[in-house]
Amino acid sequence: MALSSAWRSVLPLWLLWSAACSRAASGDDNAFPFDIEGSSAVGRQDPPETSEPRVALGRLPPAAEKCNAGFFHTLSGECVPCDCNGNSNECLDGSGYCVHCQRNTTGEHCEKCLDGYIGDSIRGAPQFCQPCPCPLPHLANFAESCYRKNGAVRCICNENYAGPNCERCAPGYYGNPLLIGSTCKKCDCSGNSDPNLIFEDCDEVTGQCRNCLRNTTGFKCERCAPGYYGDARIAKNCAVCNCGGGPCDSVTGECLEEGFEPPTGMDCPTISCDKCVWDLTDDLRLAALSIEEGKSGVLSVSSGAAAHRHVNEINATIYLLKTKLSERENQYALRKIQINNAENTMKSLLSDVEELVEKENQASRKGQLVQKESMDTINHASQLVEQAHDMRDKIQEINNKMLYYGEEHELSPKEISEKLVLAQKMLEEIRSRQPFFTQRELVDEEADEAYELLSQAESWQRLHNETRTLFPVVLEQLDDYNAKLSDLQEALDQALNYVRDAEDMNRATAARQRDHEKQQERVREQMEVVNMSLSTSADSLTTPRLTLSELDDIIKNASGIYAEIDGAKSELQVKLSNLSNLSHDLVQEAIDHAQDLQQEANELSRKLHSSDMNGLVQKALDASNVYENIVNYVSEANETAEFALNTTDRIYDAVSGIDTQIIYHKDESENLLNQARELQAKAESSSDEAVADTSRRVGGALARKSALKTRLSDAVKQLQAAERGDAQQRLGQSRLITEEANRTTMEVQQATAPMANNLTNWSQNLQHFDSSAYNTAVNSARDAVRNLTEVVPQLLDQLRTVEQKRPASNVSASIQRIRELIAQTRSVASKIQVSMMFDGQSAVEVHSRTSMDDLKAFTSLSLYMKPPVKRPELTETADQFILYLGSKNAKKEYMGLAIKNDNLVYVYNLGTKDVEIPLDSKPVSSWPAYFSIVKIERVGKHGKVFLTVPSLSSTAEEKFIKKGEFSGDDSLLDLDPEDTVFYVGGVPSNFKLPTSLNLPGFVGCLELATLNNDVISLYNFKHIYNMDPSTSVPCARDKLAFTQSRAASYFFDGSGYAVVRDITRRGKFGQVTRFDIEVRTPADNGLILLMVNGSMFFRLEMRNGYLHVFYDFGFSGGPVHLEDTLKKAQINDAKYHEISIIYHNDKKMILVVDRRHVKSMDNEKMKIPFTDIYIGGAPPEILQSRALRAHLPLDINFRGCMKGFQFQKKDFNLLEQTETLGVGYGCPEDSLISRRAYFNGQSFIASIQKISFFDGFEGGFNFRTLQPNGLLFYYASGSDVFSISLDNGTVIMDVKGIKVQSVDKQYNDGLSHFVISSVSPTRYELIVDKSRVGSKNPTKGKIEQTQASEKKFYFGGSPISAQYANFTGCISNAYFTRVDRDVEVEDFQRYTEKVHTSLYECPIESSPLFLLHKKGKNLSKPKASQNKKGGKSKDAPSWDPVALKLPERNTPRNSHCHLSNSPRAIEHAYQYGGTANSRQEFEHLKGDFGAKSQFSIRLRTRSSHGMIFYVSDQEENDFMTLFLAHGRLVYMFNVGHKKLKIRSQEKYNDGLWHDVIFIRERSSGRLVIDGLRVLEESLPPTEATWKIKGPIYLGGVAPGKAVKNVQINSIYSFSGCLSNLQLNGASITSASQTFSVTPCFEGPMETGTYFSTEGGYVVLDESFNIGLKFEIAFEVRPRSSSGTLVHGHSVNGEYLNVHMKNGQVIVKVNNGIRDFSTSVTPKQSLCDGRWHRITVIRDSNVVQLDVDSEVNHVVGPLNPKPIDHREPVFVGGVPESLLTPRLAPSKPFTGCIRHFVIDGHPVSFSKAALVSGAVSINSCPAA
């Protein structure tokens, strides 16, 4: 009813308003239609159908034919609707620009909000352009403008205000903007505040001055302080009173008596009025001002008729709504009473139901009435839709006519002059006409009436909206009533059903008795069957027990011969034969054809996979897993037997419960029988009148009896199937389970019997093994690896040559891919864990994967060693050589291992003499006849040798250790990679070992394990020498004897991955799907699990040590990100962590770590659509697919250990998967030690250990950095400090204030350097690399002995040291001498405090790559000085624009930035535009194209005009060009003095890619577009020569070029993307100069200026005063943490430089006196992907820096003779040649800049004097 009444009230006014709108649309008035619910109605003017006027092309219609309101005249004379977005009804003829924009809008089409307003003006409704809420929309708006950012409104405040919403006063002002009527006023401290501040310092709310200087006091520092007198405001001469400490007059200085009080009416003297009185006086003054302001505000409130009418309307509406609400409440109470009465008795229930049915009919009639009104509304809406369709058709007709009559054609000069004469005549005719005063008056009157009608309609519209808000409430109440009625009806039906069921049960009792008797008989029979089954089960259980004992015997036999499984030589032969897959043809093809490198890379990838499929390693691993399989079989048999036993026990329990159930059913049967007898007696005693009824009841009872019998039989069946009540079923199950246990036992016996037989056969066959098979395998492996070793260096040399020729071309990616595949091939060879037998004459040269730089300070090598069986006649082992790692000359710089005098001896040489460390505690002759672990280690000059002797029968191990130390100064093993060899077991005949290692070759078996953190193998060899297969049978090794290999774990080296195909073969996706895995890693980032299916994916990865889950199963809302936001579980601590991923009910993802819930996430219900899973990584083609790269930028493979991968609790052996790559067995402890740490300038690590740094201390570490300053190490004990730091590239050691510094000052070169510091009572020494510096007698006396204490020391920085900045770079291989521990390398993972430090990744840094641009705008040749400065020779290649995408290893992702520094872009495509002369210039092109040329290019644009291609001679007489005009392609060149012009018919500015070929052959031209349209023209040939001279301009031309030949609109730069420029089939890629060209980015763009990673800068068009006073403000969104932002430089050396450094903003200024600077480190990182505002203010010698809400300032020296200079300003970068020696070259800025303002004036980069490099002016990739 409310709906119908509301429509009846609103409909007449709405019809009246529609009629008014129709009059407004058809008449000559200025009214524009009213907007309903945001829709914008635009009138139309339909010309008469009888006579349609035709206007000639280019003529205007007579002035009398003026268009109606809302339309304008086009050049063709038609009336076209104004496009003002509903915010105006007037626009200018000809252009269509809107005037008189309303609703706070502006712009050519009223599409923008006015300054100070915010909203969506396109919606065309007044509520969408609202005043800026800064802080309040209307009453307190103190912003110039505002904008939205991340859903919040950000304000650009007036000068006096600050804060995101201008909610507080700026520094130097006071007030409370949040208080209505309050404003921010300037602080008035009478000039007595701190002069070093830019502004006066006062309380930001009250305005009371702080820190009054010059002996003043008071609220505004307006009077002299107590004890002083004088003029504090003007003269500022407050002097000390001469009253002997007594009071004096504050003005005259006259001494006053103690307790003096001034006369009434005078101000209180200073001595008697305390601060509280003055504060109270000031507060009262402020209160009075606030009262006056509030009074004026109240008086200004409008109390006119309109306000009263509005209030009355609101009151009337409220009263009406209250009345209707009370009516609804009364009805609701009535309904409630009726429902309560219905629940009391059944009779009242039936009457109430009838009453409710009647009321329901009434409600139905009302609903039909509402439905009828709704149908009327729908019909009315349909009429409106039809009118809208008619309007759309008319608009389309007008548009077609406009296109037909408005098509532009090129006019000859004669036609243009004729048109101008005609236009002048028309203008004169217009001027001669009389003005339209009368019409204007009529229009104004009608406009006033329309506005009045509009206001009335708006008030009715508000009433209508308020009424509509009541509809949901009313409808909700109706729904509640209907629901209650439905519930009541259901309750009645249920009650009736219960009555009928009761009657049925009473009639069926007789039949139940008979059925229960039969049931009891059946139960007795089942009991007999149960007893028989129990006896059978007891007999069956004896068989599994016997089987288990037999299996135990088999296991013992298998474990006894398990050590010989590794010697399965027949399987070894197959694996070794697969290693020769690399052919010479592949290498030659890669050298000859660089363009086919990708295809060869794919081929190598396939061969790489095939080298590990079904070969030696896999079969050897299969053999090593036999024991594990046997254990699994036995375990499964035990579980099956236990399950059978439990089932039998449950059967006993079920049988014991049968008796109870039988008794219960018997009692029930008796009760039913009694009830039946009672009913029968009642039936016999009934009267004859009830006989008929009784007969009917009996018939029904019989029918129900048969139905009940059926139901009872079903119940009996269910009873038999019950878990506790059915003995037969449980016994059957027990019988089946027992039989299954027997079958499993037999299968285990059948499976283990062949194994036992095979073990026996292998043991016998290995004694008589045919050496020919192994000879073939070893020779095949030797040839393959020899070929690989010879081919790979040649291939790498050739690839390096290609990369040097084109350092950043697209070939680099393919070259890098080949390198990666070669590394993976070597990685596979390194993981072959099989030993080699040496006979004393054989030798192996191993290929070391470890960097020689990593071996300088720290070297650790481990291997398995088994000496030969000792002959009885020998008492000790003969001297033997084991291994050598060092230089080829073998005179210095080496390490080795040998057996001397029956002792294992570790030898190392650091440049002068040998150090020998014999392990004399365990002679070699006493070693067991199986493998032992040997480990040699060196830290600096300290060396160790370890021996671990395992036990085959237990897990016990014997450990032996021996230490040694080099007595000289050297501490580095300085090896040259080109001059280093690694020999094992022996050496070739042409190599001469050093004297200490010149021994006979080793006899026995060796197997390499690790070198530093890398896994190595003898099978990754370069050469083998004298390896005789007949005597070199590898020895079997029982890995299970060693502690580190007892767990079935896998090692991922960061380059490989495991693949499990068809995981559903062992488990199914169900209601609960679960993945489990255990990981152990010190790394920060890595991929753990990945599943991919098209665009759908699931990914579990680690970022900064915390888990992230990304998944998309085809969700409509896109991918879901599950993140450990609370940081509950950090897993990169080198400990095992159990990770579980649970997917519940296809709609909830749960992350569990170490059995603790971390986080869960709900999603759209969707099943998991995957079958394959990648573990620890994935192939590059998977990681780099577009579907993953859009959401998953992290593509770092996992490095560390994994074990226990399970799907649905089913285990998978990762090494059994055929596609597993780069995964080894075991978990080497050395690979999990964090020996290195990376610091970012804001990080450090700390530990507390017992070390004495001031007494007998020695320590050392490696460091690598590009920064000249930084704190490397810090320790403090009270006032005594021990530190090592970098200062301008010099290493400085500071011990208790005494500094020792290195001689060399260039240690910030990005190379690794080793520092050793030693402190003794008489000398402090510092050694950097091999340079020693010392300070003797540091204390000039006896040094005080100090005890070692446990105090904290720091690496990489310190939170308590302010002298040095924190370190940026890598620190590794640190060690200390301790009292209680041996010298060993520090494991940073054990440190207690780690702040923003990466303990795994240590990126290799190098000097930044700068793009050298030429000075000036249009110079075509580079200057020699720039070549010298850049270090390039004359033949150095010019900048290649294709090289904008550098290889990933040279441009790593900034780990501290949220956004990638290289946004997604189309390969080899570049974006032009933004400036009028955006372009690339190409010079020195090969080949002559004077007679004939064929150019091709791809383009994409939405612009209608622009230059694409241009080349000419110097005078531009001969030229060739391709450009866009009106969206059409135009190809033009000259033939003599004539111009040949080919123009396309279609437009190609549709935003799609198009291929264009333009061909010139003397006087003929051809234009081919997309290979489909061929346009051809020709001119008569001439004998004139056609000569052009470069450069070729692409995307635009230099200023002043092409004006002679091309129309002005098409001279400016092409706006769009160009790609693949070719000349005669050859690509043109090397650009000599680039101006405002960036890669063609994909994805959304936003307004701003983008500076790409390739470097570039903008030179502003106006000079800038960098002298005494200025203010710069701008917003940035960086994609790197460092870079130049603004730079200005004068000729006399003064400069301003604003730049970022590791997230810190720094301002450096030189004012002619000296340098001074300030910096701000924001709390919120600048690299968080959001916009940040930076402001730099300078006033004389004071410079203030604002970064968001953080403020800092510096006061520099005053220049007595300052000079203002106006010099160019560089933004985003600066040429290196302009930097002074005091300014180190900085990286160019990478990211976006917008809203750049200088001294309050916005700066437009599109008007810049120069845009050089990769800079996009008007667009920026969105975050």
From Swiss-Prot:
Domain Laminin G-like, residue spans: 833-1035, 1047-1227, 1234-1402, 1469-1640, 1647-1820
Coiled coil: 320-403, 473-528, 581-614, 662-724, 777-806
Sorted UniProt keywords: Basement membrane, Cardiomyopathy, Cell adhesion, Coiled coil, Disease variant, Disulfide bond, Extracellular matrix, Glycoprotein, Laminin EGF-like domain, Proteoglycan, Repeat, Secreted, Signal
Organ and tissue specificity: Detected in placenta (at protein level). Detected in fibroblasts and urine (at protein level). In adult, strong expression in heart, lung, ovary small and large intestines, placenta, liver; weak or no expression in skeletal muscle, kidney, pancreas, testis, prostate, brain. High expression in fetal lung and kidney. Expression in fetal and newborn tissues is observed in certain mesenchymal cells in tissues such as smooth muscle and dermis.
Motif segment (Cell attachment site): 724-726
Lineage, broadest ranks: Eukaryota, Metazoa, Chordata, Craniata, Vertebrata
Name of the protein this chain belongs to: Laminin subunit alpha-4
Glycosylation (residues): 39, 104, 215, 315, 465, 531, 557, 578, 581, 638, 646, 742, 758, 761, 787, 810, 1093, 1288, 1366, 1418
Region Disordered, residue ranges: 1419-1440
Location within or outside the cell: Secreted, Extracellular space, Extracellular matrix, Basement membrane; Secreted
